[in-house]
């Protein structure tokens, strides 16, 4: 359904008014919606409401959509008339990247089409309360929201159906048993999850994706809590492994550390997420290209395929618990390419100190068994008297890519490494700034921020 010129102009004209209100607008929206629809407190991360992370993310997304709505509409007008439309995708890649991340997050928490109607009603009511009471403008925003909701609902159904139809796949949640719980250090526990029904298989995740864990415990918290945790195991059909960092203020992380043990049951959604290492063999790539019909699928088809780029260097950069999705990627590369790999691979990790640094033994074991050329570099913000340079760490202080000369040599030699990085917000900002300063091309920068911030890139 294409939008009229009057609708587009009305939305564009009021986007600035919404942006000027800042997070006060989206905070008012969430307060209204969660007060009048208490059941949604079982879906939304209430901690992100308190810290204003979710209101900020919604504000940014809403304004970006309003400012891009004309070009988005043009794309769908062309598509509806069976005219060439893919040329519009390059300039709209940022919008569709955000939409893809939102769609994956929505499927992980089980969002249904009917819930879009609730959100839309409260969004329009908030616009009426805080921006304008003009009926024509409100009608325009109603049509614009319906347009966006329809786009997301269709994409989410594609994701639901693809996952459910895969071997070992399912929709919504499934009961898993904690087969093993192990303490990694004073702040991190790892969990191996297997289907509660013995012998059942699980859908293989893409290396870098996450699981959503659904937790109910009325004695400890009033509402259901849902959290996403990156999968750290290599793709397989038997189990998933996650690691949970115990956050002092984290409701679910503390619950998993203190109240969940081996043998306990958890409700788990399938693996989702748009941040992953894409690795399609020739036949798989051809099938994906043939099936690409939606704008999302076409954009995915343009993403780098590391099965085809056999010599492209890969640099995995992590801060703290951010290494878990990258560990899945590293294990996958060890399985797929191993000692025969033709590409340079770097594992760069930053930790506060050696006491909270995790998974050193796993990375060392992968290097010894399968990837002897793996270059491992460790930064410790604080070095203890017992730490040994070259063994426990390589550099003291915060991460600084300029201290790794091999990267500069690769870049100077036009090898154009691909950089994957994950970690806390400050860490992510620092790494991205360093890569931009090194003039690393956009298509070589791939990241995911924990929480509702940017889209994966």
Swiss-Prot record:
One of its GO terms (molecular function) is heme binding. Residues 171-278 form the FAD-binding FR-type domain. One of its GO terms (biological process) is cellular response to nitrosative stress. Residues 168-456 are annotated as: Reductase. Residues 2-157 form the Globin domain. Keywords: Detoxification, FAD, Flavoprotein, Heme, Iron, Metal-binding, NAD, NADP, Oxidoreductase, Oxygen transport, Transport. Consists of two distinct domains; an N-terminal heme-containing oxygen-binding domain and a C-terminal reductase domain with binding sites for FAD and NAD(P)H. Flavohemoprotein involved in nitric oxide (NO) detoxification in an aerobic process, termed nitric oxide dioxygenase (NOD) reaction that utilizes O(2) and NAD(P)H to convert NO to nitrate, which protects the protozoan parasite from various noxious nitrogen compounds. Therefore, plays a central role in the inducible response to nitrosative stress. May also be involved in O(2) detoxification. This is Flavohemoprotein-1. It comes from Giardia intestinalis (strain P15) (Giardia lamblia). The gene is hmpA-1.
């Amino acid at each position: 359904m294409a939008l009229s010129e009057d609708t587009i102009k009305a939305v564009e004209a009021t986007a600035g008014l919404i942006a000027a209100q800042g997070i006060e607008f989206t905070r008012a929206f969430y307060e209204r919606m969660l007060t009048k629809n208490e059941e949604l407190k079982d879906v939304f991360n209430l901690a992100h409401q308190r810290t204003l992370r979710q209101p900020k993310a919604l504000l940014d997304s809403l304004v970006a959509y309003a400012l891009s709505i004309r070009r988005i509409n043009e794309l769908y007008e062309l598509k509806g008339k069976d005219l060439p439309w893919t040329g519009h995708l390059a300039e709209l890649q940022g919008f569709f990247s955000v939409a893809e991340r939102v769609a994956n997050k929505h499927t992980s928490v089980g969002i249904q089409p009917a819930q879009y109607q609730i959100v839309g009603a409260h969004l329009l009511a908030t616009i009426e309360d805080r921006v304008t009471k003009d009926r024509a403008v409100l009608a325009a925003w109603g049509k614009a929201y319906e347009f966006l909701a329809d786009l997301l609902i269709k994409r989410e159904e594609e994701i639901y159906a693809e996952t459910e139809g895969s071997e070992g796949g399912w929709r919504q949640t499934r009961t898993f048993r904690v087969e093993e719980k192990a303490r990694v250090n004073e702040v991190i526990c790892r969990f191996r999850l297997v289907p509660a029904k013995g012998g059942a298989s699980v859908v293989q995740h893409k290396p870098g994706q996450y699981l959503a864990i659904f937790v109910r415990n009325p004695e400890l918290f009033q509402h259901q809590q849902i959290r996403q945790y990156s999968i750290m195991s290599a793709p397989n059909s038997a189990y998933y492994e996650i690691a949970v960092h115990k956050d002092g203020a984290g409701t679910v992380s503390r619950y998993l550390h203190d109240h969940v043990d081996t043998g306990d049951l958890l409700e788990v959604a399938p693996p989702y997420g748009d941040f992953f290492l894409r690795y399609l063999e020739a036949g798989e790539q051809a099938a994906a290209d043939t099936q690409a019909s939606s704008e999302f699928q076409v954009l995915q088809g343009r993403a780098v395929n590391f099965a085809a780029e056999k010599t492209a260097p890969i640099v995995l950069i992590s801060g703290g618990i951010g290494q878990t999705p990258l560990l899945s990627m590293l294990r996958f590369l060890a399985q797929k390419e191993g000692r025969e790999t033709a590409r340079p691979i770097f594992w760069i990790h930053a930790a506060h100190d050696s006491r909270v640094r995790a998974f050193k033994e796993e990375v060392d074991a992968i290097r010894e068994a399968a990837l002897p050329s793996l270059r491992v570099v460790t930064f410790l913000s604080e070095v203890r008297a017992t730490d040994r340079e070259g063994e426990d760490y390589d550099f003291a202080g915060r991460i600084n890519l300029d201290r790794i000369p091999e990267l500069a040599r690769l870049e100077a030699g036009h090898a154009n490494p691909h950089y994957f990085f994950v970690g806390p917000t400050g860490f992510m900002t620092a790494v991205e700034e360093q890569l931009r300063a090194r003039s690393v091309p956009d298509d070589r920068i791939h990241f995911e921020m924990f929480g509702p911030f940017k889209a994966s890139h």
